[in-house]
Regions:
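Alpha-helical multipass membrane-protein architecture
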Residues: 1-632
Length: 632
């Protein structure tokens, strides 16, 4: 297309400016680890992660422009390129790998070693970048006018508005600072309860909220629509299904409860939470699996056309121009890198994958990297059905592995390892595409960005194993603190195919609930996640969504002012999410070390304190968005 060939980036190709410097690499690595760790914690708690590109861009612009008095937009862009890789790798890893810890907890196997987790993360991340590089010319350049890459374009807009970098960065840092205080008060000192709840004794239901800044921030960022669907899922679970179970079968024993323990005894011992843990979670898991499959089926025409169009574009070849903005990593480096990763996956004993598994990774990896890279350009990273791709991979790979004679826990571990690598490949390929779109608009050097992506992958890949081990040691997966919803689902799928005992009746209730939601045109995944996770958690997300609805719905404010205020709120919430994750990890370190800061025995403000703290958190969000003073 001529319009694409005539596109002029912000920094012309002939102009050479600072890009990969010691400053940009160090800052990028720090942000990759920070956002990777924070998103790992968030994803294991609520089943979703948030994009790190814009917060990383704002922080880098604020530090480089305002503090260091430098003026290099491409340097800031490389920081966010490296930094955002951490979030994407964490998203891929946490959806699958905690399943290995869950099996270890059940005594079926040993916990995965740090070497195993690190190698799986690194191989998946590196393959995600390398599989995407040959697609850059086809997707980013040739289809510049067609594929918008929403997050990549938005990130470029933020960097281009760099004169506000200092003010915007201060908003992110304010969110980080206040979230640290809130989190420390609740989970460190424990002077305010983590959740405020009210039980409906006659109904046998329960409602409440968790007093956490990150959940409020997630609700604000995803908006009222998604937050409300999640909350509806929780209402169905906690105020409809749990009361029905208690009403119709109080004296019944129902698998998977402990033998002989009736439903009424279970409720008497643990309340609605005990019924949710034993029964409703399986209904939610069935709904999540169905939601992922429905998402994949609905996307199938787009997936097929995406893969076909990408292959056609690649056949056209990329012109080996000498322009700085047209330089990619050399193809021989890419091919050698891909072969090296596949050999490591196959040959290293720490990764439980045989040659057949390595072949499946190559086939599914390249296919889903291609699909992910193009789909995020059309519908954005937030709507990219990575979980659906992971479910499809697990279904097929588990069937193939079982058919080859590899059964039992060894076969299940191999299936999860394959699913982990594919999930990370898809997440990283999508992130790389968004970052390269940002670079294309700004005039960055693709090769430099691709190296930056690899640096971010290595940095976060080396850290993710420690984060997963730490959270497991502190609280264990599958509980209230880190429920790890997607990993629990992947575990259930593999066990079901391999012949494990599952409460299939409960799972199929979730399946048909999800199908009903789809018929009603209610987005299945938010509803299913709400059904799977505790109502306290989703209620707080709903509160954040209501705040966003108020911000979006004001009629007496001009659109520019409203958009600026909403964006300030998003940046503040991104800071809260990042910092709560880091404080959570710090508290996990203290828990493992046996150090307690708990003073609740001396000072405890009870439920009233929780309500007051939630009001304070809402007011601080409004302070840095609605009531933020702009510089003249």
């Amino acid at each position: 297309m001529n319009e694409n060939k005539e596109f002029k980036p912000y920094i012309p190709a002939e102009k050479v400016t600072a890009e990969m410097t010691v400053t940009s690499v160090i800052m990028g690595v720090i942000l990759a680890i920070v956002f990777g760790a924070a998103n790992a914690y968030l994803g294991l708690r609520v089943g979703m992660t948030v994009s790190a590109s814009i917060p990383a861009a704002v922080i880098s612009m604020g530090v480089i422009r305002v503090i260091m008095k430098k003026n290099s937009i491409l340097e800031s862009n490389l920081v966010q390129t490296i930094g955002s890789a951490g979030e994407s790798l964490a998203a891929g890893a946490i959806f699958t790998m905690p399943a290995l810890f869950l099996w270890a907890e059940e005594g079926l196997c040993d916990k995965p070693s740090l070497v195993e987790i690190t190698l799986i993360a690194l191989c998946g991340g590196v393959l995600g970048v390398l599989f995407m590089v040959p697609l850059r010319n086809a997707l980013i350049v040739k289809e510049h006018a067609t594929l918008l890459y929403p997050e990549g374009t938005a990130c470029a807009d933020v960097l281009l508005a760099g004169e506000e970098g200092g003010a915007n960065a201060s908003t992110v840092f304010s969110g980080m600072g206040l979230a640290a205080v809130f989190k420390f008060v609740v989970d460190g000192l424990k002077v305010i309860p983590a959740d405020v709840s009210a039980a409906f004794t006659s109904l046998k239901g329960e409602i409440g909220m968790e007093v956490y800044p990150a959940l409020l921030g997630v609700g604000y960022i995803v908006g009222p629509r998604v937050a409300s669907f999640m909350f509806v899922g929780s209402i169905v679970g906690w105020l409809v299904i749990i009361p029905m179970i208690c009403l119709f079968g109080p004296d019944t024993w129902l698998y998977p409860a402990d033998p002989g323990v009736t439903i009424s005894q279970l409720y008497a011992a643990g309340g609605a939470a005990a019924i949710w843990s034993k029964y409703v979670k399986y209904i939610g898991a069935g709904a999540i699996a169905t939601g992922g499959i429905i998402s994949l089926i609905k996307s199938m025409p787009l997936i097929i056309s995406t893969f076909r169009d990408s292959m056609k574009s690649m056949k056209g070849g990329s012109v080996k121009g000498t322009a700085r903005t047209d330089r990619d990593l050399p193809m021989n480096f890419i091919l050698i890198g891909i072969v090296a990763m596949v050999v490591i996956i196959w040959a290293v004993p720490a990764i439980p994958v045989n040659p057949l598994g390595a072949l499946l990774i190559v086939i599914f990896g390249f296919f889903f990297a291609t699909v992910s890279s193009r789909m995020v350009g059309m519908i954005g990273s937030s709507n990219n059905p990575v979980s659906g791709m992971a479910i499809a991979t697990l279904l097929i790979s588990t069937i193939v592995i079982k058919s080859s004679g590899q059964t039992g826990i060894d076969g299940m571990k191999a299936a999860i390892a394959i699913g982990s690598v594919i999930c990370i490949i898809a997440a990283i390929a999508g992130d790389t595409s968004q970052d390269l779109k940002t670079g294309y608009l700004l005039g960055a050097t693709p090769k430099t960005q691709q190296i930056g992506e690899l640096i971010g992958v290595v940095a976060s890949g080396l850290a993710i194993g420690g984060v997963l081990y730490l959270l497991d040691a502190a609280w264990g997966y599958g509980g209230a603190e880190v429920p790890a919803p997607q990993a629990g689902l992947m575990k259930m799928i593999v066990e079901g195919i391999m012949g494990g005992n599952l409460p299939w009746a409960l799972v199929f209730i979730g399946v048909f609930l999800a199908i009903g939601m789809e018929i009603l045109r209610i987005p299945v995944m938010p509803f299913a996640i709400g059904l799977y996770l505790p109502i306290y958690l989703n209620a707080t997300i709903m509160i954040g969504g209501v705040v966003r609805m108020f911000m979006d719905g004001r009629k007496n404010v001009d659109e520019k002012t409203k958009n600026d205020q909403v964006t300030d709120g998003t940046l503040y919430c991104a800071g809260m999410i990042a910092r709560e994750g880091l404080v959570g990890i710090a508290l996990a370190i203290l828990a493992v070390a046996g150090i307690s800061l708990d003073v609740s025995g001396v000072v405890n403000f009870g439920n009233i304190g929780g309500v007051v703290l939630m009001i304070i958190m809402i007011l601080t969000l409004l302070k840095f968005s609605l009531w933020k003073k702009k510089k003249a």
